[in-house]
Amino acid sequence: MLNAIRARRILPMEGHNTSSRTDSGYYSFPDVIEDGVIVHNSSTIVDVLSFNAFSKKYTLKAEDLGDVTLTPALINCHNHLELAHLKGKATFGEGFETWIDSALPHMATPVTALSLESAVSEMAKTGTAHIADVNGRAPKAVYDAVTAYNLSCHIQFEVFGYNFPNIAAGTLCPEDLFSSTAATLPNEAKKRWMTLSGHALYSTSPDALVVAKQWCRSHERYFSIHLSEHLGEDELLTKGTGRFREQLSRRVLPKDFTPPKMRAVPYAKHLGLLDESTLAVHCVHCTQEDINILQESGTTVCLCPRSNELIGVGTAPVRNFLEAGLQLTLGTDSLASNHDLNLWNEARYLRDNFDIPTGALLRMLTIAGAKALGITNELGTLSKGKRFHYAILPEDF
């Protein structure tokens, strides 16, 4: 059965270049359908057109949403929903080392159903349709909470640590990298939404990261990794010293750990982790050399600006990324390091602090995220055949 909704404006985001180069029109405001209509069958978009064209083509009555602007539904490219119960429990503003020390004692506690429901409800109400979720301990609970709101999510099983079966013998298998909790997921989720992500270069065996990336590449899944998030990371990797080194030595690093003596981005390149299907999360402390490496490899950067500010790790060089032509997406990160999971607030932060125009922000929130996660056949634009999901552009944009 066909239905239709009508809005004062529709921004389909269809046919727009996802490149961030200034000569690509990335900064320009996207094309607008004034007085537009979306025809749908409840699950799939059937048509997107002006009300005038709709009136001539269909006999349906369109539900009028009023003086609003519709955009494609938003894509949250980085989250940790299994930490939804940590809201307000970590220390902000004193740097990464202090933050992780304050959050770790709470991470052992399983996420509650109420916390998950509240987090997913907030994302649904603010226009998010898909979430790239880093997980390991509660994949089934997260998947059920997300699908209950008719949203979708990638479940990224996080590869963490140095102790893996057969790693010393050089025969580590990809299957060894998945948490045993993967078995709890329904087959549909395993086939469609399950992937691997590396925690970070400092916290994970390089051999395990390479195997994880190879698995993602061979299964045509994207690979995600926290990269260059804070200064302690680069000090550990380049010199093997610092407070962060001492912190990790108590919990994670093997006794024979030797730093690669490379910054995070060059080291990721050295390991073969960077390409068009890699999502590098944070990238706060990137030099021009780092930016060039990311651009040349085709790596997408996922910005989590409010999380970075709240923890106190610094601010990513967003303008430099844009000028270099990097594809940028947005994520909220978790409620352990953010006040909410509203992607519009991430966009507001970039607008207010970097003067990034609405057109560029909309691309980060929609089509760029869909491209990075490999779901442009379902989301990213308001187009015929895509899933019927939309967001309402806030009035201050």
Describe the predicted segments one by one.
Residues 85-115, 157, 230-275:
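Active-site gating loops and adjacent loop-to-helix segments of metal-dependent hydrolytic enzymes
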Residues 75-77, 131-133, 153-157, 194-198, ...:
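Hydrophobic faces of well-ordered beta-strands that scaffold small-molecule active sites
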Residues 1-57, 375:
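N-terminal metal-binding scaffold of metallo-dependent hydrolase/deaminase domains
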Residues 252, 270-274, 316-395:
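His/Asp/Glu-enriched, well-ordered alpha-helical/loop segment
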Residues 133-136, 197-213, 227, 309-312:
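Active-site glycine- and acidic-residue-rich loops that bind
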Residues 69-70, 87-151, 172-189:
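Alpha-helical scaffold segments that flank or form the walls of functional sites
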Residues 149-152, 215-222, 273-276, 293-302, ...:
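Glycine-enriched alpha-helix->loop->beta-strand junction motifs that scaffold or abut catalytic
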